[in-house]
């Protein structure tokens, strides 16, 4: 942080000084500068080796967002994404209606709870998603984030019960990692809970209304209960949730969260029959099941039927993305393939001979940047705006990430512009990415104990996400990866990679 402040202070101070100088002052300064400096400045193109990395499977639990849908981009083929998620009991021993099940039995006053509606709601990401206190206005359109493909596409959604327990502890008693090619989930899909044959997403907020109280003259059903962020909201089977939840009031299955998670193991959400490609990044932290039910009550001898709403959470438990790729054609070994979700990354290694040359030559590195040049012979539906560079052995960010003066910018689009430059375009097409690794290279030269580790390169969904995870290569060995690449289906083909170094050296 201190280094950042020094950089900004010097930069701003320099601007102020230059602004205050007159032309005469500049001439005076120029005449006082040495005519023959005792150093040379030069540019050097270092030798790097680049390897394509094909992911057999990738960790897909513990993510900030989850993909659902279908996306096609030649030559990377078609990506399909399905979501499996636990359902979380918000509190132990829930009461449905005005009385507990024990009181209903003791007083012989059955409330006859009956499910009338049930819904699955999963919000999209939008400009307010990072604010947990954000409120939404009725019938208002919002700018959605991370929707890839055609937003007008229609598609089918199927929701089924999951009959496989998603444990958070593996057989080695360590936190369990779930992979994109998990085989237990697809073979344990149970009863269909919803089947919507044609669905189209909307960027409008979702308004829920209160329930009418027959004891009053007002019609409360016309009043707002709350307004939800734009998202997927589909009807679920009322009979399923009648049996699975409401009829279990007072039972052992609903007595605590652990027993509930083994009783109702979760849901699997899949899509099909797309009119056009559409891949959505969903905010599963805000996902929930809404159960609307009626119940009988007696007040001062007057019987009436009321309605209430009960919610189960999908956020807060284990969620897994199942990812399938098909029709890939990545045959040109001279090119570098980078693809998000279950896809491809690359490994870049700086030649040891060059590292030795930098050390022995006492070079003062002023800038070291990786340039990745885009292959424009490929037609891209949408090009990734950012790439991510990281330590390929640990999955951690480089030192340049920590000292980027734009790191505090509010949005990811405005952050880390020095270290992780945006895609530069020419004639409307992507030309190159510039990834500045100056501090990484300087540390490598100055510190003899630092290892010349390979650098991982991946498509980034957000440069603010620094979490690392695990992927399996084609041999089944596991390696580290930056998980920001998981939350996007976008891809690019790189035709050339160069490490260009600007330096000064004493004469």
What do these predicted regions represent?
Residues 2-507:
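Secreted, disulfide-rich extracellular signaling modules
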């Amino acid at each position: 942080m201190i280094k950042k402040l020094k950089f900004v202070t010097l930069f701003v101070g320099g601007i102020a000084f230059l602004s205050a100088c007159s032309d005469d002052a500049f001439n005076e300064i120029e005449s006082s500068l040495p005519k023959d400096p005792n150093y040379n400045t030069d540019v050097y193109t270092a030798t790097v080796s680049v390897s394509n990395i094909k992911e057999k499977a990738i960790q897909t639990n513990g993510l900030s967002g989850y993909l659902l849908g279908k996306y096609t981009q030649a030559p990377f083929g078609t990506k399909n994404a399905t979501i499996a998620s636990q359902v979380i009991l918000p509190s132990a021993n829930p009461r449905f209606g005005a009385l507990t099940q024990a009181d209903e039995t003791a007083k012989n006053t059955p409330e006859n709870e009956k499910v009338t509606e049930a819904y699955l709601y999963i919000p999209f990401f939008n400009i307010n998603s990072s604010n947990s206190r954000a409120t939404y206005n009725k019938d208002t359109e919002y700018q959605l984030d991370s929707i890839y493909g055609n937003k007008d596409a229609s598609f089918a959604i199927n929701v089924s019960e999951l009959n496989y327990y998603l444990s958070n502890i593996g057989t080695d008693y360590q936190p369990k990692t779930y992979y994109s090619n998990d085989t237990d989930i697809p073979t344990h899909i149970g009863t269909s809970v919803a089947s919507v044959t044609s669905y189209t997403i909307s960027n409008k907020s979702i308004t829920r209304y209160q329930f009418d109280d027959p004891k009053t003259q007002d019609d409360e059903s016309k009043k707002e209960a709350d307004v939800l962020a734009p998202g997927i909201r589909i009807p679920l089977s009322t009979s399923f949730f009648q049996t699975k939840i409401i009829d279990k009031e007072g039972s052992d299955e609903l007595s605590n969260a652990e027993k509930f998670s083994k009783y109702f193991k979760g849901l699997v959400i899949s899509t099909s029959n797309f009119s056009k490609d559409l891949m959505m990044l969903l905010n599963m932290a805000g996902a929930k099941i809404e159960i609307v039910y009626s119940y009988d009550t007696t007040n001062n001898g007057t019987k009436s039927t009321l309605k209430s709403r009960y919610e189960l959470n999908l956020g807060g438990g284990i969620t897994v993305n199942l990812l399938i790729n098909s029709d890939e054609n990545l045959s040109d070994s001279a090119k570098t393939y980078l693809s998000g979700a279950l896809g491809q990354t690359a490994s870049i290694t700086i030649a040891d001979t060059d590292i030795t040359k930098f050390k022995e030559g006492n070079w003062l590195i002023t800038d070291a940047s990786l340039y990745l040049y885009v292959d424009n012979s490929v037609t891209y539906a949408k090009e990734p705006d950012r790439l991510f560079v990281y330590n390929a052995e640990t999955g951690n960010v480089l030192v340049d990430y920590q000292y980027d003066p734009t790191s505090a910018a509010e949005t990811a689009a405005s952050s880390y512009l020095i270290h992780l430059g945006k895609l530069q375009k020419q004639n409307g097409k992507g030309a190159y990415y510039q990834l500045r690794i100056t501090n990484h290279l300087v540390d490598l030269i100055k510190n003899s104990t630092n290892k010349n580790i390979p650098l991982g390169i991946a498509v980034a969904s957000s440069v603010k996400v620094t979490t690392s995870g695990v992927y399996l290569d084609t041999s089944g060995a596991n390696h580290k990866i930056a998980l920001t690449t998981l939350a996007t289906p976008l891809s690019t083909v790189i035709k050339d990679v160069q490490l260009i170094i600007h330096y000064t050296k004493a004469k």
